């Protein structure tokens, strides 16, 4: 079984496919079922919903034995905290009413492989059994006792154990909430997606420790880590954060091996190694209790009392046991631990536990023997180092020392987090059902996980319990210093806290022999490449290293010089190198969006044009003014095409086409729209004066007017070509950032921002003029073709270009100018084209394709009908009305004298008439 567990750990680390792991799980689960026959030690509590629990009840055993001595605080205290929390929840009428929480609690023996074997108990109910071919000796089918279904797991404690268990539980989608695992790698939501924790990850405490070290003025420290995920990942996080923060050097990183032949010799060697850098007095420790105790003992043997300045992680926290008999060597040690509070209710609960009232805890008898150093008369007693008999009348806290273990609060919070998630899940899925409804039973772990990640309640310490997207709790730490001198109560003293930022009371700190002055842990390492030495007066052996900043490089040991204009410092600032040349790439996010929009627009434009050509002689197409419609669609098409020219690699040909087409598409579009709106305006203005049709309203005249307007744009472009021929340049100023590593030379066309605006200026003038005409014709009856759609188009287009101008010029000094301006320009043109296409043509295409019954000739309209409509519109405009637009026609009829000539005209449908 152990070998299979080790094999699974290897396969998990090698990221084997889930199918392979699941096959092995079936084998392991079968073995686990057999294992229960001879290893029955687990706690079972019946309930409607069962939670799993993983606790280090025992320490690691010697070679060949999975479990060792019982762990009174880390094991029994935490286990009883879960039982206490279950009792509290089950007696709370407001939390999970009509639902009883049960439990299946297992011992991990502080070993990841053993914990893996134990945790297979949680997945037995999820493994299908095929018993179709199985018969008992009497010929009857077998009856299997279905194991309880575990919906979530509380635990584990050690990070290495949680990592191993999490790999199994995620395969069966069982959510897991740890109360003590802080390894940073557990924050990887891709690998440990069903893992959450009520304690912050080590990356947070590493940041807190970096802040502490810097606040004390130390810039030269060593690190010490126990071998394993917790220690090594903690130091890795500390090192990474210290590098990012700057001003902090790591003298050396020492690892404490897990398997040691001679503990004394190994730890003496570690102390000697730390003394190789005597100026690095500060030692940052991520280690377990036993390693902390051994390193302090080794420092004492080396007669280094007062030399080392210890900075301990939460594994040290405020524990007394690792410091026993080594208080003098530990004086001044600074430690941190997650902010916590003593749960008074648990103290009352635990100190009242006896052998009689706590039979549900199968390990409590063993704890009793160890705690009171006595031997029970029951069979199976493991206490062999004493002849003192237990009476059963001993009391915890009275006949033995008792102090609440530091993680009790987090165990309770973890159980409550699971309970709150189940409570909200029950309310949502079983609103009108008492207890656990079938929908909740079948919901699965993935749904429960969503509820877990959304919990937010005040925990046992009064602080909010919540999880971020990676399942981590927020970082809140208390900072302690161990003080024994000049104090009436030797021990840990609270000197600060860390919640995203450090609050440290330096005046409350003291060091060896009661010294208040902060001892130093600083010295100067040789300057790195790219730094110059700046010697300090009176200390020639130490100096400050000043980096060559900006575009400087290290000319010699004492001097920095500037690189040439088109160069930047190399990576280590020992010389200069050419600045890379960049352009807007097709795969860049800045280009992908405009290109995507342009491609959609081109497809839509071609579709509209094809539809109009296909139905060229239908009333709707003829009513829209076929000639100008095709001109307008051509302009819209060119507006989309310019996107590709703006993103293409600049050369003389591309730059030439940019100049031609930059404003041409817009010019064609707005010239056609201006001609249309002007024609509508002139017709209705003329209709108010006489029945004579205005001049130049025929299709040929309209095309001639449009061509004349477009020719002005082309003439301006040709003059531009003659005055300033197209060319390409490399602009080093645009991307010459403060950080030379980000400096780039921009390959672009020799076109200034002002030239771009001038090229677009004529088109904008046409757009504004067209908007003016759209406003003037806003009172035209809605059935007179395209006056109002054109108006809406122009209003929207004006908004687009009003937004474009501040963005375009507001980013002129930005390091991302090339990308922002190009993207803004192309998107603005795409949006302008899309607005025109969507408002003017999509409704027509919709009718043509989906409602052909509306695409019919209703009645032709003479100019007299237009005159009549103009007269009616004029009369209507003189009478104020509060009615909505939908009642305009009714009011039009109400305001016409029935005896007037206009009123005697027959009502004419204005649909599909060319205006």
From Swiss-Prot:
The chain crosses the membrane at residues 591-615, 628-648, 655-675, 703-723, 754-775, 789-810, 826-850. The modification Phosphoserine is found at residue 900. Pfam families: 7tm_3, ANF_receptor, NCD3G. One of its GO terms (cellular component) is receptor complex. Residues 874-895 are annotated as: Disordered. The keyword Signal applies. Residues 879-892 have a biased composition (Basic and acidic residues). One of its GO terms (molecular function) is glutamate receptor activity. It comes from the Eukaryota. Belongs to the G-protein coupled receptor 3 family. G-protein coupled receptor activated by glutamate that regulates axon outgrowth through the MAPK-cAMP-PKA signaling pathway during neuronal development. Ligand binding causes a conformation change that triggers signaling via guanine nucleotide-binding proteins (G proteins) and modulates the activity of downstream effectors, such as adenylate cyclase that it inhibits. This is Metabotropic glutamate receptor 7. It comes from Mus musculus (Mouse).
């Amino acid at each position: 079984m152990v070998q299979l567990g080790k094999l699974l750990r290897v396969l998990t680390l090698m990221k084997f496919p889930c199918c392979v792991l699941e096959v092995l799980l079936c084998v392991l689960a079968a073995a686990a079922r057999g294992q229960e026959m001879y290893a029955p030690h687990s706690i079972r509590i019946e309930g409607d919903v069962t939670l799993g629990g993983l606790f280090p009840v025992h320490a690691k055993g010697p070679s060949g034995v999975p479990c060792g001595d019982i762990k009174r605080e880390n094991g029994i205290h935490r286990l009883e905290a879960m039982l206490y929390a279950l009792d509290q929840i089950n007696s709370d009428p407001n939390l999970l009413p009509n639902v009883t929480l049960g439990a299946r609690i297992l011992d991990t023996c502080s070993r990841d492989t053993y914990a893996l074997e134990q945790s297979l108990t949680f997945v037995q109910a999820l493994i299908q059994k095929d018993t179709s071919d199985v018969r008992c000796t009497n010929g009857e089918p077998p009856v299997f006792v279905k194991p309880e279904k575990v919906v979530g797991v509380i635990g584990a404690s050690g990070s290495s154990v949680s990592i191993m268990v999490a790999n199994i539980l995620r395969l069966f989608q069982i959510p897991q909430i740890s109360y003590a695992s802080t390894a940073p790698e557990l924050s990887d939501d891709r690998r440990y997606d069903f893992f959450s924790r009520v304690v912050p990850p080590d990356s947070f405490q590493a940041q807190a420790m970096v802040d502490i070290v810097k606040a004390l003025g130390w810039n030269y420290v060593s690190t010490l880590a126990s071998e394993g995920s917790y220690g090594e990942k903690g130091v890795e996080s500390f090192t990474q954060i210290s590098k990012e923060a700057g001003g902090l050097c790591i003298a050396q990183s020492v690892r404490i091996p897990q398997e040691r032949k001679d503990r004394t010799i190994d730890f003496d060697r570690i102390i000697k190694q730390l003394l190789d850098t005597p100026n690095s007095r500060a030692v940052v420790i991520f280690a377990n209790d036993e390693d902390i105790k051994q390193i302090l003992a080794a420092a004492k043997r080396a007669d280094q009392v007062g030399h080392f300045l210890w900075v301990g992680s939460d594994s040290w926290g405020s524990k007394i046991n690792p410091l026993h008999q080594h208080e003098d060597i530990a004086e001044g040690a600074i430690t941190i631990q997650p902010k916590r509070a003593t749960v008074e209710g648990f103290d009352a609960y635990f100190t009242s536990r006896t052998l009689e009232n706590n039979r549900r805890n199968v390990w409590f008898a063993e704890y009793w023997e160890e705690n009171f150093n006595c031997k029970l008369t029951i069979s199976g007693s493991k206490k062999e180092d004493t002849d003192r008999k237990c009476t059963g009348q001993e009391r915890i806290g009275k006949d033995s020392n008792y102090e609440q273990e530091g993680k009790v609060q987090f165990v309770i919070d973890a159980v409550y987090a699971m309970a709150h998630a189940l409570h909200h899940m029950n309310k949502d899925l079983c609103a009108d059902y008492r207890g656990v409804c079938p929908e909740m039973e079948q919901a699965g772990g993935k749904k429960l996980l969503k509820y877990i990640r959304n919990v937010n309640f005040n925990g046992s310490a009064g602080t909010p319990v919540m999880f971020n997207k990676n399942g981590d709790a927020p970082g809140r730490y208390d900072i302690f210093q161990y003080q024994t001198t000049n104090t009436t109560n030797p021990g840990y003293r609270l000197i600060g806290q860390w919640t995203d930022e450090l609050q440290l009371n330096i005046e409350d700190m003291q060091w060896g022999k009661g010294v208040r002055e902060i001892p130093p842990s600083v010295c100067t390492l040789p300057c790195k490449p790219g730094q110059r030495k700046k010697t300090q007066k009176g200390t020639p052996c130490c100096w400050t290293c000043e980096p060559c900043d900006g575009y400087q490089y290290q000319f010699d040991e004492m001097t920095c010089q500037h690189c040439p204009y088109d160069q930047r410092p190399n990576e280590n600032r020992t010389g200069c190198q050419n600045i890379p040349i960049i352009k807007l790439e097709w795969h860049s996010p800045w280009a992908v969006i405009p290109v995507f929009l342009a491609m959609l627009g081109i497809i839509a434009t071609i579709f509209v044009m094809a539809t109009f050509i296909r139905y060229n002689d239908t009333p709707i197409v003829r009513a829209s003014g076929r000639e100008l419609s095709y001109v307008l669609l051509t302009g819209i098409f060119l507006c989309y095409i310019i996107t590709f020219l703006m993103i293409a690699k600049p050369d003389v040909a591309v730059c030439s086409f940019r100049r031609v087409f930059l404003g041409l598409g817009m010019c064609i579009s707005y010239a056609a729209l201006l001609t249309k709106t002007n024609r509508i305006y002139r017709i209705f203005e003329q209709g108010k004066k006489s029945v004579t049709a205005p001049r130049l309203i025929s299709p040929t005249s309209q095309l001639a007017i449009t061509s004349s307007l477009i020719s002005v744009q082309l003439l301006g472009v040709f003059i531009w070509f003659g005055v300033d021929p197209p060319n390409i340049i490399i602009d080093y100023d645009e991307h010459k950032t403060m950080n030379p590593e980000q400096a780039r030379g921009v390959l672009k066309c020799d076109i200034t921002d002002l030239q771009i605006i001038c090229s677009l200026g004529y088109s904008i003038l046409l757009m504004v003029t067209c908007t003016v005409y759209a406003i003037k014709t806003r009172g035209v009856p809605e059935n007179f073709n395209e006056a109002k759609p054109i108006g809406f188009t122009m209003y929207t287009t004006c908004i687009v270009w009003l937004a474009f101008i501040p963005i375009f010029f507001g980013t002129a000094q930005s390091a991302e100018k090339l990308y922002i301006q190009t993207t803004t320009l192309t998107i603005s043109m795409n949006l302008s084209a899309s607005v025109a296409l969507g408002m003017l043509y999509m409704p027509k295409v919709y009718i043509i394709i989906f409602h052909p019954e509306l695409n019919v000739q209703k009645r032709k309209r003479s100019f007299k009908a237009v005159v009549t409509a103009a007269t009616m519109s004029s009369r209507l405009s003189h009478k104020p009305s509060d009615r909505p637009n939908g009642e305009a026609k009714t009011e039009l009829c109400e305001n016409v004298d029935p005896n007037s000539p206009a009123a005697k005209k027959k009502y004419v449908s204005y649909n599909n008439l060319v205006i």
